[in-house]
Amino acid sequence: MAAPSLESNWLVQIPNQSGSHVAQARKDSFAEHMSYNKTHIEAGRMVLAGPLVEALPQDGQPPVITGSIMVWKATAGEREMLDKWLSDNPFATSGVWDLTKMECTPFLCGVRKGL
């Protein structure tokens, strides 16, 4: 049996900036952020995304959002496109994300759906 081909991906983790403005900036720019993401979601480039939280919410309490995480299906040659998308994203331009602390780690995805 041949080994399955592995897909090139980037695991992107971006913390929020510090400061009391961040929660409101995230809320205010959320609709624009989602609209900005739509093209990449539909093209199959952004395959997973969501907020990073301080802890899993309990008892109906709202989560404390500390940043964002996403998986991008992209080759090494597309890293420049990914960096531009991140820097132009409404969460970056509105002061939510701290791109200076971003971690963008390449990985090879062997399983995308459960077995």
From Swiss-Prot:
The record's note on what follows loss of this gene reads: Does not affect the production of xenovulene A.
Pfam hit, one:
YCII
Q: What induces it?
A: Expression is significantly up-regulated under xenovulene A producing condition.
Checking InterPro entries in the record gives:
Dimeric_a/b-barrel, Sec-metab_biosynth-assoc, YCII
Spell out how it gets used.
Xenovulene A is a natural product exhibiting little structural resemblance with classical benzodiazepines yet is able to displace high-affinity ligand binding to the benzodiazepine site of the gamma-aminobutyrate A (GABAA) receptor and could be potentially used as an anti-depressant with reduced addictive properties.
Which PANTHER family does the UniProt record give? PROTEIN YCII
Record's function text = Part of the gene cluster that mediates the biosynthesis of xenovulene A, an unusual meroterpenoid that has potent inhibitory effects on the human gamma-aminobutyrate A (GABAA) benzodiazepine receptor. The first step of xenovulene A biosynthesis is the biosynthesis of 3-methylorcinaldehyde performed by the non-reducing polyketide synthase aspks1. The salicylate hydroxylase asL1 then catalyzes the oxidative dearomatization of 3-methylorcinaldehyde to yield a dearomatized hydroxycyclohexadione.
User: What protein name is recorded for this chain?
Assistant: Xenovulene A biosynthesis cluster protein asL2
Encoding gene per record: asL2
